[in-house]
Amino acid sequence: MARQNNHYLGNPHVRGLDDVHDWTKEEILEFKKCKDSAVYFAENYCQVIHVDRGLVPFKLYDYQKEMYDHFDNNRFTIVLACRQSGKSISVVAYLLWYALFNTEKTVGILANKGDTAREMLSRITLMLENIPFFLQPGCKALNKGSIEFANNSRILSAATSGSSIRGKSLNIIYLDEFAFVENATEFYTSTYPVISSGRSTKVIITSTANGIGNMYHKLYEGAVQGTNEFKPFRVDWWDVPGRDEEWKKQTIANTSVLQFEQEFLNCLETNCQ
């Protein structure tokens, strides 16, 4: 067990820079398994807050595992997902894995509101605080807006304003709920030089549907038609375990057909069936 003065600013759950860890053979094997697979890392070492059960292990659904493979194998990913499908928390765990097991990488989390971006960073912090020290590279800085590790990788969070990432070299850019970002076209135009400046920079865009004509809709439709570099990934309501026709019927009864269509049908057309 690490000594108290080797914690980050007295936080007993975050490894400090001066911590010296004596590795066991089992830990070395586990580290390699985690480094080689985001799915293994997430399922075995990440914890999330469940609305009824509190802090619980993060068990990925099949479509979440497929999403990780999609991230690994594509530089540009755009995800269309129904409401409450776990898309954001899935990406959060993936970004933590990427920063922990790669050196000198910078991840940018951008959301339509600064509070939303910081909330996602707080989820990453919670995950970090619940993984063992041998998987943590040591922490240089941890605050509401960023985390920086001893391996010189860092995670930044910001609102999707035109100046939020200018001048920064990013290895992964994550845009959350992009269909709801105001002035999304202006933002994307100002962001694209950052994206295109590196040959390996990954872009992950996720959102629920928000009608047609917006920048998200344009990018997603272009991905489906193969006219841009993005590769589409879709999560429908029936992909989520526990959601069947009876669940659909009950949800509509408790809300309305219109609300169900808006929240769960992934409608990018004017008329949804």
What are these regions (language model features)?
Residues A2-Q273:
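Phosphate/NTP-binding elements of NTP-utilizing enzymes
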